[in-house]
Design a protein with these regions (language model features):
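Extreme N-terminal, non-catalytic leader segments
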Residues: 1-8
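NTP-dependent small-molecule kinase module
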Residues: 2, 15, 120-207
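A structural/positional concept
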Residues: 8-14
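Hydrophobic/aromatic beta-strand patches that form the interior of the parallel beta-sheet core
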Residues: 9, 32, 112-117, 146-150
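Conserved substrate/cofactor phosphate-moiety recognition/catalytic segment
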Residues: 14-61
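A short acidic (Asp/Glu
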Residues: 19-22, 74-78, 160-161
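Short, structured coil segments at secondary-structure junctions
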Residues: 27, 110, 141-142
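ATP-dependent NMP and nucleoside kinases share a basic, alpha-helical "lid"
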Residues: 52-56, 62-138
C-alpha cells in the first residue's frame, strides 16, 4: 500500500481522447500516460507499471492513469464468458499468471481506485461489451475502490470523471492480487445483476 499524498486512479478501458484532454487540463489532476503506447507491441504490463510508478510520485491531488497492468486479465476474463465465441479459461489463466508474476516481483501494485466509464447507472447494464471484469469480480473484491461514471458523450464523461474523483469513498485496501484472481475464477456474470454496491456517478442534472 502506497503512502503518499496523491490519489492514484486507473481509468479502465478505452477513454476518448477528448475526455483525457479535458481531464488533463484540471489543476487538480495529473494525467499520466505510458511512455510506450500500450498497443505498440511492447510489454503492456511493464508500460502500465511504469505509468503507475510515475503516478505515485505525482504532486497533484489526483493522478489519472489510462492504462492498467490488469488490462489483459480483464480482456481474457470477458472473452471467457463470450457466449458467441467461447474460449475457455486457458487465456485467462495465462494472463493471470503473467500479472501475478509481475505483481509478486514488485513491478506494480494496484492503484488506489479504478474508474470505469459505462453507459448506464444500472450495474447489470453498465458494461459496453458484456460481462466486465472491473464491474464484476474486481468490484466485488472491494466495492469502495471501483467507481463508475455513467455517461456516453465525451463532454459528460469528462465532467463525470472529475466529479467522481472528488467523491471517492474511503475503505479497506485491496486484498492480495491472488485473492482478486481467485474471485474472478469463481465469479459468474449473472451475479452482476445482484450487486449494487458500486459508486455510480452520472453527469450533473441540467438546470
Amino acid at each position: 500500500m502506497r503512502r503518499n499524498s496523491c490519489t492514484v486512479v486507473v481509468l479502465a478501458g478505452s477513454a476518448p481522447g477528448e475526455v483525457l484532454a479535458a481531464v488533463g487540463r484540471s489543476m487538480n489532476v495529473a494525467l499520466i500516460r505510458p511512455e510506450e503506447p500500450a498497443d505498440s507491441g511492447g510489454d503492456s504490463i511493464e508500460a502500465a507499471a511504469g505509468a503507475l510508478q510515475r503516478a505515485g510520485r505525482a504532486t497533484s491531488p489526483y493522478a489519472l492513469v489510462p492504462v492498467d497492468p490488469l488490462a489483459a486479465v480483464a480482456a481474457s476474463w470477458r472473452a471467457m464468458w463470450d457466449v458467441a465465441q467461447p474460449q475457455g479459461p486457458a487465456e485467462f489463466e495465462q494472463e493471470a499468471a503473467k500479472a501475478l508474476a509481475a505483481w509478486r516481483a514488485g513491478r506494480f501494485e494496484l492503484p488506489d481506485y479504478y474508474l470505469v466509464l459505462a453507459r448506464s447507472t444500472d450495474a447489470a447494464d453498465a458494461g459496453d461489451h458484456g460481462p466486465d471484469f472491473y464491474l464484476g469480480p474486481l468490484r466485488s473484491s472491494r466495492p469502495h475502490r471501483v467507481a463508475v461514471v455513467a455517461a456516453t458523450e465525451p463532454a459528460e464523461q469528462a465532467v463525470g470523471v472529475l466529479q467522481a474523483l472528488g467523491s471517492l469513498r474511503h475503505g479497506p485496501w485491496w486484498p492480495a492480487l491472488d485473492e482478486v484472481i481467485e474471485t474472478a475464477r469463481s465469479f459468474y456474470p449473472d451475479s452482476l445483476a445482484e450487486s449494487s454496491a458500486a459508486r455510480v456517478v452520472g453527469p450533473p442534472a441540467s438546470s
